[in-house]
Each structure stands twice: as structure tokens, then as C-alpha cells.
Amino acid sequence: MFAILGATGNAGRATIRQLRKRGFKVRAVVRDESKAQDLEALGCKIAVADLHDAAALAKAIEGAETVQAICPISPRAPDPAGNMRAIVGTICKALVATRPAKVLAISDYGAELGAGTGITLPFHFLEAELRKTGVALTLLRSAEHMQNWSRLLRTAAETGVLPSLHHPLTKLFPMVSARDVGIAAADLLVSSGPQASPRLVHVEGPRRYSALDVAETLGLALGRTIVARELPRSDWIAALIRGGLGASYAALVAELYDAHNAGLIDVERGATDICRGATEFGDPSIFPPALVAAAAPPSSKSG
């Protein structure tokens, strides 16, 4: 039995689909059962647990031989990093109580760094705390998700401009489809044989991209020319808040992109276990037609 935390997220759902395709039993651990109907239709058992309740989470994963842990981030929480650290504590208590044979945790590029990485820093804490549990552990560090750029579809559609926190615009950086993260996780979950603990694996897409590539892809999806422009550092936090992020989260994102632009967010030095997903950034699954249509300005929808 595989227990999947964060089952309703993009990566969690992709892991579950792969496991069910291969005939494995899956228990989907969710906070809101109403969002798990499609998972139930796939044949999953559904367990409901609050990620701040260690006893409830332990009950949800009890009996599972293998657990996939995904620690969510709350962009509008007053203290997003503190909230995530609290959830990490809950997850670790549940794992110690239930002692599954194998745990895979989805982490983040740059998680080896202990300072200066903004919203990636809680993943450093996640990895450190999981190591203390003594469980057989695989750390799957994910590059930036391609799907995250959908947040800028509306801005690009309305203005013809892609404001970029990646500086310079020509700088190549790793990205990966959330679906490919889930597929890589499923492969690792079912792998057998002896392995080092923790096993460290990085996952990114088939190649690296620049902000110029992103603008070109958004332009093709939207049917108009999109120009990438470096957003001045002094404007980052205000722009992120206008985009719907809480002030604390916006500050953490800004610090992360400072680290990105300094070349710090990458495969850990000396690491060799790198999985490359097959999905290109221009794949229709990244920006489905319905998502693109919803981002179009009202005038273009009516026309």
C-alpha cells in the first residue's frame, strides 16, 4: 500500500495515476474529501487528515509500506515558512509513529543551502528533519514547475509583456512539469533493491529555458507577441503582492529569485542522480486551452 500526502496537487495526482496504472493499491491522504472524487474513481482509498494533527496523520498513513510526503506552502499565510515548518513537524511525528518501510519526500532545488533561499529554505528544514526520523528516505528535489508561469498569463495577455524576476533574460534555468515530477516519484516509489539513505534525486525537464523562451511560448499560447522584460528588483515585492501573494510570501519569493540570479538554485554540487522529464515547456498540458481562454481580456473573449 502506498500512502500519498498532498494527493490533490498536480504532482500528487500524477504519482497516483502512475501507481494505479501499474495496479498498486493507493491511499490518498487529503484535507478536503470533496476534492478527491476523481482519486476515488481511480480506485484510491481516501483518508482525511489535517496536516497540523500528528495523530490524525499517523492514522491516515498507518499500515502503508511506502509514503510520499509533499509539504504544501500557503502563499497567503501570515508566516508561510513557519506554517510549513509546523507541517514538517507533524509529518515527522506521524512517520516516527508508523515507521513505514520507505518514504519519498518531494523537495526543491537549492534545499541543500541553509540560508538565503527564501521560500526554498523550509525545504532545507524538511530534509534535515526527515533525516532525523531514521526512515529509509528518498529526497526528490524538483526544479521550478512549468505550470507556475500560468499566474502570468493574464498579465501577458492584457499587456503583451512578461515581467521576469529571472535576470538576465537570456539566463537558462531548470524547469519541470509537475506531471513529470509525479511520474519520477512513482518510478522511485516502486524501485526495489538496496540504496543509500537518504537517496538524493533531482528532477527537471528535457532542457533548460530562459525568460525569452517563456515569453515566446506564452505568445504562441495566447496568439499574440509577448515581450519579456526584466522587472526591476525594487518592484518585485509590490508586483508579487498585486499578483495575490501575501506580503511575507512575496518577500520569500523575492529572496529566492535573488538566489536564482546569483546562480545558487541548481543541482547540488557533486550530485549525479538526475531525472529528466519528457514534457517540453510548450506542451499543451502546461497551458491547457481552457486556462488560456480564461486569461484572455474580456474584449478578446467577446470578439
State the predicted function of each range.
Residues 192-193, 260, 295:
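A general structural signal marking secondary-structure boundaries and capping sites
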Residues 1-27, 31-41, 52-55, 59-62, ...:
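Oxidoreductase cofactor-interface core, primarily capturing Rossmann-like NAD(P)-dependent enzymes
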Residues 83-88:
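Aromatic "clamp/platform" in nucleotide-sugar-dependent glycosyltransferases that forms part
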Residues 271-303:
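Amphipathic terminal alpha-helices
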Residues 201, 215-262, 299-303:
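Terminal hydrophobic/aromatic helix or amphipathic segment near a protein terminus
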Residues 49:
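Cofactor-binding loops of NAD(P)H-dependent oxidoreductases
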